[in-house]
């Protein structure tokens, strides 16, 4: 393992980094700074420095770069193939990012914790009460989080785009991606890339 690209440094995303001592860890600078300061009750619980104390090679990025499907400041990463891009998606944390991967079948966008449930990407979004409460409790900036959800939702429902969006915590989306990796192709021409998660 030479490179690990993180959406953010919450404990459930950064666990195990020390198991890859030779890897370069890529993250937005704002995320690294918040994780280092750990100011406030939530930050002291969400960021656990013991998970990355042994990491020797970090790459920090400021939001800058090109436009990509309606998102700004999208950039490539040092030493990583150009098919992998970092997409700033602040809100859940101020340094939260999505990771876009250009594949022969189209783009994959790991939206991390920008949303938690597949139905949040529906044209008429919904979320289970528990997940909604957790998102609100953990958010750094509600307006930014909701704005990024709106932009992700618009992209997910744009039948002309070739972007498949998924989050970090929805098991149905995970199963769909696992089927995709085995060659399963459920979509008809012109259908939403998100429809397969219904």
Predicted segments with their positions:
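Active-site metal-binding loops of divalent metal-dependent hydrolases
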Residues: 9, 31, 91-93, 112-114, ...
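Active-site metal-binding motif and surrounding structural segment of the metallo-beta-lactamase
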Residues: 1-27
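Short, well-ordered alpha-helical microsegments
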Residues: 12-14, 94-97, 174
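Cap/insert and terminal regions of metallo-dependent hydrolase folds
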Residues: 105-198
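Catalytic core of the metallo-beta-lactamase
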Residues: 22, 42, 60-122
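Metallo-beta-lactamase
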Residues: 29-88, 137-160, 190
């Amino acid at each position: 393992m030479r490179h690990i690209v993180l959406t953010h440094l919450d404990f459930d995303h950064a666990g195990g980094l020390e198991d890859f001592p030779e890897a370069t860890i890529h993250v937005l600078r704002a995320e690294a700074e918040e994780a280092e300061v750990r100011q406030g009750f939530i930050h002291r619980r969400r960021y656990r420095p013991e998970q990355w104390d042994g990491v020797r090679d970090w790459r920090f990025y400021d939001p800058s770069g090109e436009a990509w499907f309606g998102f700004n400041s999208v950039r490539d990463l040092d030493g990583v193939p150009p098919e992998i891009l970092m997409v700033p998606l602040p809100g859940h944390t101020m340094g939260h990012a999505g990771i876009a991967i250009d594949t022969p079948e189209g783009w994959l966008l790991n939206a991390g914790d920008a949303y938690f449930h597949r139905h949040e990407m529906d044209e008429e979004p919904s979320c289970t009460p528990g997940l909604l409460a957790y998102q609100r409790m953990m958010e750094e900036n509600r307006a930014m989080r909701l704005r990024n959800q709106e932009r992700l939702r618009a992209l997910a429902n744009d039948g002309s785009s070739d972007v498949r969006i998924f989050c970090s915590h929805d098991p149905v989306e995970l199963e769909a991606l696992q089927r995709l990796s085995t060659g399963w192709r459920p979509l008809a021409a012109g259908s939403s890339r998100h429809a397969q998660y219904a």
